[in-house]
Curated annotation (Swiss-Prot):
Aerial growth, conidiation, and dispersal of filamentous fungi in the environment rely upon a capability of their secreting small amphipathic proteins called hydrophobins (HPBs) with low sequence identity. Class I can self-assemble into an outermost layer of rodlet bundles on aerial cell surfaces, conferring cellular hydrophobicity that supports fungal growth, development and dispersal; whereas Class II form highly ordered films at water-air interfaces through intermolecular interactions but contribute nothing to the rodlet structure. Expressed in conidia. This is Class I hydrophobin 3. Disulfide bonds join 31-70, 35-61, 36-53, 71-87. The lineage of its organism: Eukaryota, Fungi, Dikarya, Ascomycota, Pezizomycotina. Self-assembles to form functional amyloid fibrils called rodlets. Self-assembly into fibrillar rodlets occurs spontaneously at hydrophobic:hydrophilic interfaces and the rodlets further associate laterally to form amphipathic monolayers. Its main location: secreted. The gene is HYD3. Belongs to the fungal hydrophobin family. Keywords: Cell wall, Disulfide bond, Secreted, Signal.
């Protein structure tokens, strides 16, 4: 039970460390369609981040119970699932 208290913070540090390497960009310049479980405010990197996001070309987020979003990147880099960076919810 005690190991669970330390697992989440160490995972979060790994994600934030990866996100910190993103260069500053315009908000809508590199926006791509993604599906996320939730979009939440973030202190660093500034803006909003998406939780449990994946690239979505079919735009069927509602079918899986996720939120249709637009994010600049997903970290860690090179994967299809992860934390969305600089996200916004699509209407």
């Amino acid at each position: 039970m005690l190991f669970r208290l330390f697992t989440i913070p160490s995972i979060a540090l790994g994600v934030l460390g990866s996100a910190a390497t993103l260069p500053p960009r315009e908000e809508s310049a590199n926006c791509r369609s993604v599906c996320c479980d939730a979009i939440v405010p973030s202190i660093f990197p500034s803006g909003r981040v998406g939780i449990n996001c994946h690239w979505d070309e079919l735009l069927d987020c509602g079918f899986s119970g996720q939120v249709d979003s637009c994010c600049e990147a997903i970290v860690p880099f090179g994967v299809k699932d992860g934390t969305g960076i600089r996200c916004s919810r699509r209407q």
